[in-house]
């Protein structure tokens, strides 16, 4: 299952940057585990986005854990919006089209901190 995570900064960029090395290290760990397909900052620099692929079984729990364990979330620097996504067309997609949306909680899943 695919998901897009929109990350919105809750603090000034100067403060967010103090945690960015830990955030990047965390993302590299997600990439090594095969969960993170792409990541990058938004323009203007008020947040970022992640393209995630998680197993269908336990998808919501995995997405919640990804959000909750991010140093940005743990320090209150940012909040996540998790959006389940069903890609239909693209260079790296399997030939079969996904016919149904997975049954997850509502699309918005914010950190409960701060």
Predicted feature descriptions by range:
Residues 1-114:
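Conserved, structured core segments of small domains
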């Amino acid at each position: 299952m695919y998901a897009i995570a929109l990350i919105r900064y809750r603090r000034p960029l100067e403060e967010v940057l103090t945690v960015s090395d830990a955030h990047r290290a965390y993302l590299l760990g997600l990439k090594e585990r095969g969960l993170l397909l792409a990541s990058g900052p938004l323009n203007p620099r008020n947040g970022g986005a992640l393209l995630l692929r998680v197993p269908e079984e336990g998808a919501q729990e995995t997405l919640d854990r990804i959000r909750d364990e991010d140093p940005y979330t743990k320090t209150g620097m940012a909040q996540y919006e998790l959006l389940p996504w069903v890609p239909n067309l693209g260079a790296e997609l399997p030939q079969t089209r996904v016919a149904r949306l997975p049954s997850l909680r509502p699309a918005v899943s914010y950190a409960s901190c701060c």
